[in-house]
Amino acid sequence: MKFIILTCLLAVALAKQRMEQYISSEESMDNSQENFKQNMDVAFFPSQETVENIYIPQMESVEAPMKVSDIISQQQYNQKMMDMSVSAREKTVMTEESKNIQDYMNKMKRYSKITWPQFVKLLHQYQKTMTPWSYYPSTPSQV
């Protein structure tokens, strides 16, 4: 526990030292922020005054002409969606084997909802007791 606290304090102290290097004076603050951005890949948000002084020209709303590749890809997308909706409506006929598998999976879903001790109790009810006489069938022999 002491080691973790010591490590955290050391990390905070090193972080403060790095920040103090970048904020040494008012004149070098802009340069240091640029260097810090380049070195650390961090985004700084501009102050309110800088945001108000920025001129943003109003752009006219002009629709870009659709390229031929965009039109083709849009048609392909529409065709795929239509195929998917048609295939979703088709009913599939299940074979006997797939019905058996689905029934088995539905039965197993019930067991996934119960806890382990309940499962063991339920399983114990269905187990056959094994005795040597029932396991090894033998016929009485005459001597």
Curated annotation (Swiss-Prot):
PROSITE patterns for this protein: CASEIN_ALPHA_BETA
Keywords: Milk protein, Secreted, Signal
Pfam families (UniProt xref): Casein
Coiled-coil annotated residue ranges, if any: none
Main location (coarse class): secreted
Gene Ontology, cellular component aspect: extracellular region
Subcellular location(s) per record: Secreted
Keyword DNA-binding: no
Expression (tissue specificity): Mammary gland specific. Secreted in milk.
Keyword Signal: yes
Residues of the signal peptide: 1-15
Record InterPro entries: Alpha-s2_casein, Casein, Casein_CS
Family, as annotated: Belongs to the alpha-casein family.
Role of this protein: Important role in the capacity of milk to transport calcium phosphate.
Protein name: Alpha-S2-casein-like B
Encoding gene per record: Csn1s2b
